[in-house]
């Protein structure tokens, strides 16, 4: 997921800066907002959505356990949370599966506030948007809201190699192999860890699904990546844990949704729906149904 990877790396850089510590918007420069764009292009009001009986969610394609299609049927954590939102608003949830762009800015521009130059569709809501105050003030065209979970980095491992009292930590990967998603934050972290001492043992895969498949097949000793993806790919021969990760600026982040800035009433309604589902346990049950740990968001 190029957009999420690039965005999380950027957030790590922001978090390490002095401007962020004092004022996340200290170096903020005003951005252009959409001009002369029709209502059917930039989004829709609440009453229009309820009259038409459905709303459109942008979700990332081929991204288990969060959003994918199985025999043409949408599945995943983000799909089920989107359905909760739509149900609370009294409409049907429809989905636009999108590929990740170069960064989160591009994804928000193409899917929420402007539209792609060719064949783009504007969604009412975009799921799985990393929430950060420094990034939030840099994208005026979008309302960041509806924080519904946290994600964090973990390490999955072969239980035949590592015993319960000797689970792997990054220092082990000076000698042991570890699988990561190529160009992910885990890849960048391990490549620079201890002055690059573990970089030679890092095995890179196109995505975490393939990385976990390699671990389960005994082709690598461990895998490092987002906890949810690791848990979803576990087998009877593998397990996962979360050791302290020294120097990892963004080992945990909050996930929410994005709505076009022109439709704040919709953003409020979406946030309310998510808040209710957090309070009554429905979102936690969604994670449980996919065999995942639920990490409550900071709201």
Question: Residues of each region from the PLM?
Answer:
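Periplasmic-binding protein-like
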Residues: 149-156, 227, 231-274, 293-299
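Hydrophobic residues within well-ordered alpha-helices
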Residues: 85, 112, 214-216, 270
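Ligand-binding cleft/hinge of the Venus flytrap
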Residues: 83, 87-97, 172, 183-205, ...
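Acidic, polar ligand-binding/catalytic clefts
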Residues: 95-170
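Short loop->beta-strand "edge-of-pocket" segments that line small-molecule binding or catalytic clefts
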Residues: 55-59, 168-186
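A ligand-binding cleft/hinge motif common to bilobed small-molecule-binding domains
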Residues: 127-138, 191-192, 216-251
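Extended ligand-binding regions for polar small-molecule ligands
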Residues: 22-40, 82-88, 159-163, 175-177, ...
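Extracytoplasmic small-molecule ligand-binding "clamshell" domains
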Residues: 23-25, 31-124
């Amino acid at each position: 997921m190029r957009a999420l990877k690039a965005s999380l790396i950027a957030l790590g850089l922001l978090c390490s800066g002095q401007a962020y510590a004092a004022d996340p918007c200290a170096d903020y420069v005003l951005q252009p907002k959409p001009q002369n764009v029709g209502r059917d292009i930039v989004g829709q009001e609440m009453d229009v959505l309820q009259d038409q009986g459905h709303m459109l969610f942008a979700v990332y394609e081929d991204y288990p356990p969060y959003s994918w299609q199985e025999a043409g049927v949408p599945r995943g954590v983000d799909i089920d949370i989107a359905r909760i939102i739509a149900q609370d608003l009294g409409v049907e949830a429809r989905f636009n599966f999108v590929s990740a762009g170069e960064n989160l800015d591009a994804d928000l521009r193409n899917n929420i506030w402007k539209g792609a130059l060719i064949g783009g569709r504007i969604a009412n809501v975009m799921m799985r948007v990393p929430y950060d105050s420094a990034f939030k003030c840099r994208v005026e065209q979008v309302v960041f809201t509806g924080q519904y979970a946290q994600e964090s980095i973990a390490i999955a491992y072969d239980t035949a190699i590592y015993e319960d009292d000797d689970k792997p930590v990054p220092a082990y990967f000076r000698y042991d192999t570890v699988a990561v998603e190529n160009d992910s934050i885990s890849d960048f972290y391990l490549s620079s860890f201890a002055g690059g001492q573990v970089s030679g043992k890092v095995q890179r895969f196109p995505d975490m699904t393939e990385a976990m498949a390699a671990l389960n097949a005994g082709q690598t000793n461990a895998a490092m990546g987002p906890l949810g993806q690791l848990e979803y790919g576990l087998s009877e021969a593998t397990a996962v844990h979360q050791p302290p990760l020294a120097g990892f600026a963004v080992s945990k982040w909050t996930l929410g949704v994005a709505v076009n800035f022109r439709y704040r009433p919709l953003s409020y309604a979406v946030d309310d729906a998510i808040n209710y589902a957090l309070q009554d346990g429905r979102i936690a049950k969604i994670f449980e149904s996919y065999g995942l740990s639920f990490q409550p968001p900071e709201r």
